Amino acid sequence: MNEPGLIEISKCEVCGTAALRPVLDLGAHPMCDDLVPIGDIRVCREYPIEILFCDRCRTAHQRFQVPKQDLFPSTYHYRSRQTLDVLNGMRRLVDACIEKYGDLRGKKVLDVGCNDGSLLSIFAERGARTFGIEPTGAAADASASGHAVLNAFFGEEVAEDFVRRFGEPDIITFTNVFAHIEDLAAVIRALKVLSRQQTRIVIENHYLGAIIARRQFDTFYHEHPRTYSATSFSFIAAALGMVVADVEFPDRYGGNIRVFLSHSAETVAAPSPLLERERAFGDDLACMPEAIARWREKKTSEIRSAVAQHGPLAAKAFPGRAAIPIKMLGLDRASIDAIYEKPGSGKIGHVVPGTRIPILSDNDFPATKDDKPLVNMAWHIADEIETYLRGRGFAGDIIHIISLGDFAA
């Protein structure tokens, strides 16, 4: 049953088919960025996470979509600049654009959902003229970095306003944003307004194949109404009157897909074997609940054992996706004393959604010689987190909230 305020999806937003099948139900969860200040008694509202799959275009959908105004308020906390893995991935994206499109000097680059302008700053280093569209308070950060930014949700009217002010961009980028957008049909129309024959579009998002292979069920949080395959993007390109010129698979966020779209590609990607492999995605997703049940049992036992021996544990990092395993494992102050974030994070001073676990600064982290294990909530960037912790003197064991071994039968 649809809950008040939610948008229920009844057909595929990519190809239009009504034959969507349910493949995964993770239960009810708070929004991952609904951060309540420490001491505030407000209780986060929870929304269902049910995944539907389209076997025609191989796209995974949230059955119930939370309105964008609730997901991305002006107080949205995420900032790209605070995660090294994200910044490194952005540099590689810019390098890929130079490799494919040549010298960027003087080119107009528009980043939709530009957040704090981190990607635009890298483009600017290469001589590009930089523009952004960003609905949250992060737009102020991007503007302060010297980029021309429209503080609004992306849509046809905003696209028309952009063209009136700045003309059509040469390159349009979406980095982990295309999955966040509420009304895909409206986005397609807006992109048609922005594009001219020479415009290239570069989209990077979580790849459904990597999510399946690495059991990354925690990426199915409310901010991602859709998760895409290469097949998905072939349909999206056709809707735009474009072609998929190339497809890459960066090892970012645990496995991304990066597609390069153009109106008349010099070379067109020939992903036939890839598209054939994606035919099994629906059945693979339908098998995921059994694997998740094994993870839940093993991780619950591992954390309970550590807590029984050491008392409540400290945890490192709160990426929004961690809200899902935290809820599914029933973690609270009895098991996790606090989660520590890099100084300057907007999450500090709040509690983890759906819990009373405080998010504190790394500067408040307890003695580095403490031999208690620590729980890493950012398991998808485990190497970065471990290097950071060891560099700060932490010598204890690290329990990753999700590990591939947890899913083994």
Regions found by a protein language model. Name each.
Residues 2-84, 248:
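N-terminal juxtadomain amphipathic helix
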Residues 44-142, 216, 221, 288-305:
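Extended interfacial segments that mediate partner engagement and assembly in macromolecular machines
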Residues 96-97, 103, 122, 265-409:
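Hydrophobic, well-ordered beta-alpha structural blocks that scaffold small-molecule cofactor pockets
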Residues 119-157, 335-348:
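Class I SAM-dependent methyltransferase SAM/SAH-binding core
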Residues 173:
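A conserved beta-strand element that flanks and buttresses the S-adenosyl-L-methionine
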Residues 185-200:
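A short glycine-rich, Lys/Arg-flanked "PGG" loop and its adjoining helix->strand segment in the class I
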Residues 198-206, 397-400:
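Conserved beta-strand signature within the Rossmann-like core of class I S-adenosyl-L-methionine
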